[in-house]
Amino acid sequence: MGRYLGPSCRLCRREGIKLYLKGEKCYTDKCPLAKRGYAPGQHGQEKKKLTQYGMQLREKQKLKRYYGILERQFVRYYERAERMRGITGENLLQLLERRLDNVVYRLGFAVSRAQARQLVSHGHIEVNGKKVDIPSYLVKPGDVISVKESSRSMELIKNNLEMGRNVPDWLELNKDAFEGRVVSLPRREHIDLPVQEHLIVELYSK
């Protein structure tokens, strides 16, 4: 299945939470979820009792949409998380958080992960002084993520940084230098996403 190309706000309404897919609009009262906090469609306002499988599937879909990844990619992340030491669900979240496009978003260079993915793919981002144009690239502690010098004059990036969004504790931002550093690996408490990752583990453990 290809990448979803429909209205982004429908996905937020489907999952019942803000997925921050539309950038700046998501931080304002114009967000459709604030006006219509129910699922889209003719029966969207009806309360439906989900089965256990339905709940597991809903959590997986929520996580995939939050990070903007496809099923095949998601399965690869899950399989890698299973092989790591520790709790599989938390390992999965850590891997997704370490994606370069997510880090570019978290540092405030972009207002959405989709925009961050474009900045990376178009060669505007460097890791440790070298261009990296792979959105799925996994960062590690000590890595320095920066905007390429020739791209620092872009109004888009400057305006995004001026918004002054909070940066998670596992990252640090030097706004004046257009760069951020990975201080540590992200832990569960750093990830402000209301997802029940244990349900995803149950789904794939069947």
Swiss-Prot record:
Domain S4 RNA-binding: 98-161
Gene3D superfamilies: Ribosomal Protein S4 Delta 41, Chain A, domain 1, RNA-binding S4 domain
S-S bonds: none
Gene Ontology annotations of biological process type: ribosomal small subunit biogenesis; translation
Alphabetized Pfam families for the sequence: Ribosomal_S4, S4
InterPro entries documented for this protein: Ribosomal_uS4, Ribosomal_uS4_bac-type, Ribosomal_uS4_CS, Ribosomal_uS4_N, S4_RNA-bd, S4_RNA-bd_sf
SMART domains, alphabetized: Ribosomal_S4, S4
CDD domains referenced in this protein's UniProt entry, alphabetically: S4 (cd00165)
Keyword terms of this UniProt record: Ribonucleoprotein, Ribosomal protein, RNA-binding, rRNA-binding
GO (cellular component) term, any one: small ribosomal subunit
One term of GO molecular function: structural constituent of ribosome
The protein's role, per its UniProt record: One of the primary rRNA binding proteins, it binds directly to 16S rRNA where it nucleates assembly of the body of the 30S subunit.
Family recorded in the similarity comment: Belongs to the universal ribosomal protein uS4 family.
PANTHER family in the record: 30S 40S RIBOSOMAL PROTEIN, SMALL RIBOSOMAL SUBUNIT PROTEIN US4M
Quaternary organization: Part of the 30S ribosomal subunit. Contacts protein S5. The interaction surface between S4 and S5 is involved in control of translational fidelity.
Name of the protein in question: Small ribosomal subunit protein uS4
Species the sequence originates in: Caldanaerobacter subterraneus subsp. tengcongensis (strain DSM 15242 / JCM 11007 / NBRC 100824 / MB4) (Thermoanaerobacter tengcongensis)
Lineage: Bacteria, Bacillati, Bacillota, Clostridia, Thermoanaerobacterales
